Amino acid sequence: TLGYVPADAAKISVSLTLEYAWADGSIALLADALGKTEEAQYYREKSLNYRNLFDSRTKYFRGKNSDGSWVSPFSPDASSFYDDILGTELARPYCEGSARHWRWTAIQDTQGLLGLFGSREYFVSELNEFMENSSNDPMALDSAGGFWIGNEHNLHAPYLFNDAKRPDLTQKWVRKTLRDSFGTDSGGLAGNDDGGALSSWYVWSALGLYPAAGTDHYRIGSPNIDEACISLGNGKTLRVIAENQAEENVYVEKVTLNGERLSS
């Protein structure tokens, strides 16, 4: 097989390839848990197929044809939303967004994704620029150049700074998004909630946690609540206490669990 969905055979080929790889990574973890060693290795290798669409020259995931040629012309800001309006196909390989939106989708292999950028510093610089160009527009017609909380392909993006050893930037951008992109009026969500996706992002982020989908790991952000008590469903509870939490106190000094300091 090619190891990717060819652009000349299917629309949204990049998005499909990236999400298939993510799903394969989750299957590998399940196989590990079941003691299925061979199956785990098979799906773990498949989960790296996302790399087949990463263009080392542009540092973006791009559509690739069956013969191995890149889809051209290419613009990282060409959006499928503009295609729908204008009747063009400049962003045909991407679902509900642009190459810039889908640039961060390798949740099953974040360190591998970092490596594709060439350096941690470059990755942080590009991701930070992406966050600086955030859009709160529910229609998303101006969001192709930056982070857009209103659609699911970006939900994890601010938490990737943790993987690049810059938790301060995760904390900065999560708190900014909580403050600027959510409200209590009729326009309180910056997009379609899509089965509770945006609402759950808010709840998790307000607690200072974010689940790494397909794993039992959680990333740490910056809570905007003073205290919360969560029922774990087994007779136990998780009590979250954020000391000195305030709008101006964004950065987390330390995190402890049952009195023991967590290292990451």
Model-derived features: where do they sit?
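Exposed beta-strand and adjacent loop surfaces of beta-rich binding modules
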Residues: 227, 252-254
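Short, solvent-exposed S/T- and G/P-enriched segments that are highly enriched in secreted/extracellular
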Residues: 262-264
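Active-site core of glycosidic bond-cleaving carbohydrate-active enzymes
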Residues: 1-224, 228-239, 244
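A short beta-turn/strand-edge loop motif at beta-sheet boundaries
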Residues: 246-249
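Short strand-turn-strand beta-turns centered on an Asx-Gly dipeptide
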Residues: 233, 254-260
